[in-house]
Structures are given as structure tokens and as C-alpha cells.
């Protein structure tokens, strides 16, 4: 068990064996935040850091190809203020991308009580998401504001 603050979370690892071969670790969650969200995960494909924000509620960034110490250094040392913030510091995410050019960074923004409002991919291309008055996904737009997908909700009443 790994301690985080006054909480304890299990160190989670997954192992596999192919045929009669040796067991190998395929997933290892090395570090957690104060609420138990994974912060640093090592898989066969490589290492991934997850940065949470919006007071620990939502994923703000997924950083592939960097260690937690590299991310901490790029973010100015302490990750807690970033994670506790009601909205993430966008300037820190921009600096993170500049400081870790070898990493593949995907970042997310959210509208409270609704959902994801934007996703910025590792190339810096942004997809925007809009919602209707009932908080249903209404439209997905590209980096230039052009509609990529539109959603139309039609309900019918079955008459018996």
C-alpha cells in the first residue's frame, strides 16, 4: 500500500505471461494524487503522467513520454496548487509543452456540470465541444471553428 497524505491507495500493477514465458509487468501505477487518481503510470508502451485539476475533479493533461519528476520541474516544482485550482493555469500548460518537446501532451478543458469543452492534441490542434441547454453534446468544432460533427437529439413517444 502506498501512502498519499493521510490516505492509503494500493500500488496497482498488472502482470502477464505469454505461453510458458516469464511473467512481465505490463502496467504499474507508481504515484497518486490526494484523491487516489493515478499521477504516474508505467506501461509496456512507456511512461505517462496524468495531471488533474478543477479541484482534483477532472483530467487536465495526459503527458506521454515524460517522468513525474520532469513534469514537476517543468511546472515549477509543486503540482498541488495546479491540481487544487478551480480552473487550471493555462500558462503552466503552455510552458509544460515548451519544456517537454519530446513528450506527447494532450490537454483538456471542462465546463462545470456539463463536460469537456476542448481537447488539445500533442500537435497543438484544438477540438472544441459545445452543449445545448439540456447539457447534451451539440457540436464538435475544429481549430478554425468549423463544425466537424453535429448532434441532433430526436425523441419519440411510443403509443400503445
Task: State each model region's role.
Residues 1-121, 126-160:
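Beta-strand elements of repeat-based all-beta scaffolds
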Amino acid at each position: 500500500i502506498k501512502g498519499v497524505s493521510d490516505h492509503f491507495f494500493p500500488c496497482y500493477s498488472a502482470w502477464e505471461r505469454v505461453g510458458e514465458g516469464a511473467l512481465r509487468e505490463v502496467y504499474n501505477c507508481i504515484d497518486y494524487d490526494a484523491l487516489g487518481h493515478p499521477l504516474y503510470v508505467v506501461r509496456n508502451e512507456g511512461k505517462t503522467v496524468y495531471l488533474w485539476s478543477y479541484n482534483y475533479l477532472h483530467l487536465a493533461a495526459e503527458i506521454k513520454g515524460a517522468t513525474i519528476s520532469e513534469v514537476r520541474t517543468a511546472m515549477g516544482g509543486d503540482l498541488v496548487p495546479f491540481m487544487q485550482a478551480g480552473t487550471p493555469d493555462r500558462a503552466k500548460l503552455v510552458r509544460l509543452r515548451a519544456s517537454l518537446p519530446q513528450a506527447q501532451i494532450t490537454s483538456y478543458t471542462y465546463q462545470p456540470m456539463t463536460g469537456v469543452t476542448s481537447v488539445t492534441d500533442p500537435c497543438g490542434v484544438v477540438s472544441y465541444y459545445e452543449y445545448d441547454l439540456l447539457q447534451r453534446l451539440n457540436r464538435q468544432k475544429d481549430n478554425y471553428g468549423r463544425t466537424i460533427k453535429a448532434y441532433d437529439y430526436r425523441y419519440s413517444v411510443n403509443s400503445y
